[in-house]
Amino acid sequence: MNIHEYQAKEILRKYGVPTSTGLVVTKTEKINETIDKLNTEVYVVKAQIHAGGRGKAGGVKVVKSKEEAKKVAHDMFGINLVTHQTGPQGQKVNRLYIESGCDILKEYYFSIVFDRSASCITFIASTEGGVDIEAVAEKTPDKIIKFSVDPATGLQDFHMRGIAYELGFKDNQAKQMKEIVKSVYNAFIETDAAQIEINPLIVNSDGNLLALDAKITFDDNGLFRHPNITAMRDHDEEDPLETRAANAGLSYVKMDGNIGCMVNGAGLAMATMDIIKLYGASPANFLDVGGGADRERVKEALKIILSDKEVQGILVNIFGGIMRCDIIAEGIIAAAKDIGIKVPLVVRLAGTNVEKGEEILSNSGLAIIPAHDLADAANKIVEAIR
């Protein structure tokens, strides 16, 4: 789960991380009133969307008067902001964060992530802050600093000292950086975060370190422990089909293709998407119904797939282990009769009760195309939509 910048800063401040502060606006009629509450020489108006690249896309504006800030805020509120992360459709700006500006002497990058390849928490830092860190890693990888934390021992003093040293901090600034490292680590662990990113972390004119922008992504599997964080969820920033799927206990990610996929198991789902590409089409979604899906969940999964107007055909690929193939077959038939599937539907079943499942499908009287293996299924669905 993602949250907005102003929410991320609120959490970080609770853990002792110094951040820039401001006021959030959620209604156009509150813009002037909110800006009047800020007494500053420089105003920073920031669009609040769940995507990076806001600055380059015009979603962050620095102005030097109240009237100019009000005009910029009114112009920005409600627009569709297109960044390199939103896609061409953009993301509607429903919230603004208005801050007091500050002098910046130097910008840094600092983040903490769970590194799945190394099976540990990793700090990533760079003296090149305020820019796309992926570009820095590609062009000047020597400027990327990494410190891994052994899960058996946790954060140690040498991690904090090392990060401060590698970033070139000394004396009081080194002490500040060590405290920030510790605070961010504690926030990461205690909130079940998947990533905390501060970009940029700045040194201001007073020589103090300050988080000027912040992003936090949470592990969805840990949200049940944090109702206060779950309450921060902004459904307007999420795909409505993905929200609907999550409420039904389904793992669904919308994609840009034309073949809808319903599969059980994340690995099998990715293999199914790969083979669809191999045979010349593109997957419209990732959808894992899980190992314990029942008839109603299968029915809802197909409804969600068909809610995507770009879907021209559906490939169902089920390996029946915990999931019985006859249950899948009954769900497919129920959905087909209920909503009327008007696109080609290819079904490949294997595993528990496969013969019974295939018999149910063949006796249904519906135009369901059976497949014997994954390659056969991919070939048939691609041919069916041509």
Swiss-Prot record:
The keyword Metal-binding appears for this protein: yes
Top-level lineage group: Bacteria
Binding-site residues for ATP, renumbered to this chain: 46, 53-55, 99, 102, 107
Disulfide bonds: none
Reaction(s) catalysed (UniProt annotation): succinate + ATP + CoA = succinyl-CoA + ADP + phosphate; GTP + succinate + CoA = succinyl-CoA + GDP + phosphate
Gene Ontology BP terms: succinyl-CoA metabolic process; tricarboxylic acid cycle
Record note on cofactor: Binds 1 Mg(2+) ion per subunit.
Subunit (UniProt): Heterotetramer of two alpha and two beta subunits.
Protein's name in the database: Succinate--CoA ligase [ADP-forming] subunit beta
Species in which this protein is naturally found: Rickettsia africae (strain ESF-5)
Encoding gene per record: sucC
